[in-house]
Curated annotation (Swiss-Prot):
It is found in: Cell inner membrane. Part of a complex composed of FtsB, FtsL and FtsQ. This is Cell division protein FtsB. The gene is ftsB. Keywords: Cell cycle, Cell division, Cell inner membrane, Cell membrane, Coiled coil, Membrane, Transmembrane, Transmembrane helix. The chain crosses the membrane at residues 4-21. Residues 28-76 form a coiled coil. Belongs to the FtsB family. HAMAP family: FtsB.
Length: 93
């Protein structure tokens, strides 16, 4: 009877070790859980970025004002018969 109880205890210890430290055990579960949280945050940021880009694309497709604004800001273009003034601050003051 004593040998039977000792065998059951050894079996329990073996299963517990496998549960905590084995492949796909509790520690692996915690690592994967943390990775899933991180990936969800990344996906949320990328989704927001995609929505912003999509809105900008729709604006460029549908509106002349967006194209004009982009040309003015990024390429410093001006309309015909328009004068462009650049004001530079004095570094000494």
């Amino acid at each position: 009877m004593r040998l039977f109880i000792l065998s059951l205890f050894a079996l329990l210890v073996m299963f517990q070790y496998d549960f905590w430290f084995g492949k796909n055990g509790y520690l692996d579960y915690q690592d994967i859980k943390a990775e899933i949280i991180q990936r969800k945050q990344e996906n949320k940021k990328l989704s927001q970025r995609n929505q912003t880009i999509f809105a900008e694309i729709q604006d460029l497709k549908n509106g002349i004002e967006a194209i004009e604004e982009r040309a003015r800001m990024e390429h410093e273009m001006i309309k015909q018969n328009e004068v462009f003034y650049r004001i530079v601050k004095n570094k000494n003051r």
